[in-house]
């Protein structure tokens, strides 16, 4: 008989069925009870690499890859809370390439899907979204991170150094860092107009993280 994972029991019943009733703001958080860490996930920002690191020596189930739920910061005062962000331009292009050019992730109709392969058309579609509450791959990073309670926000552009800082802070010594989910990367040159539109969409992200 498989024993109930106490970490998962605590996480799901407390966060999903109690805290979510009294707190409306939610985040995609991964909990590591072994290393006492909370990772606020920002998609298209080395997520698989960070996830792999947090699984280190956690065969006991002490690592929970949580879904979109509320949480109470006061319950995790002694936890290391961190996240990583990425320049909104490159993050946006990465999302478009992965979720549109490589697959029809957003389930557009066949006709609409062909149009979305044109970056200008896709940008105009994203402009119609509530950027703070839309799909997490396009959502504002500021909306994905509880900035008032962060201990550390690393940068994708300085990933190796910032990632090592997290490893040292969590005292994880036996993890060999390597980028996961890395395909062939080709530079994509945005037009001035495209760049301007992306800056408008992610104005708050640029102001807070890349001013």
Question: Model segments located where?
Answer:
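Membrane-interface amphipathic segments in extracytoplasmic regions
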Residues: 1-211
């Amino acid at each position: 008989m498989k024993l109930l994972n106490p970490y998962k029991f605590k996480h799901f019943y407390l966060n999903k069925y109690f805290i979510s009733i009294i707190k409306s703001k939610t985040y995609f958080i991964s909990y590591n009870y072994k290393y006492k860490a909370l990772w606020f996930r920002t998609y298209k920002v080395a997520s698989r690499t960070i996830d792999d690191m947090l699984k280190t020596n956690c065969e006991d189930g002490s690592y929970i890859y949580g879904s979109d739920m509320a949480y109470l910061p006061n319950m995790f005062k002694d936890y290391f809370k961190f996240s990583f962000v990425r320049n909104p331009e490159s993050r946006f292009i990465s999302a478009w390439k992965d979720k549109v050019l490589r697959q029809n992730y957003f389930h557009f109709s066949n006709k609409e899907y062909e149009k979305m392969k044109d970056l200008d058309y896709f940008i105009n579609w994203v402009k119609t979204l509530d950027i703070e509450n839309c799909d997490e791959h396009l959502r504002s990073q500021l909306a994905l991170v509880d900035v008032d309670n962060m201990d550390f926000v690393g940068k994708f552009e300085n990933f190796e150094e910032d990632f090592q800082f997290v490893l040292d802070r969590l005292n994880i010594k036996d993890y060999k860092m390597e980028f996961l989910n890395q395909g062939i990367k080709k530079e994509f040159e945005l037009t001035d107009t495209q760049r301007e539109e992306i800056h408008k969409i992610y104005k708050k992200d640029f102001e807070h993280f890349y001013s």
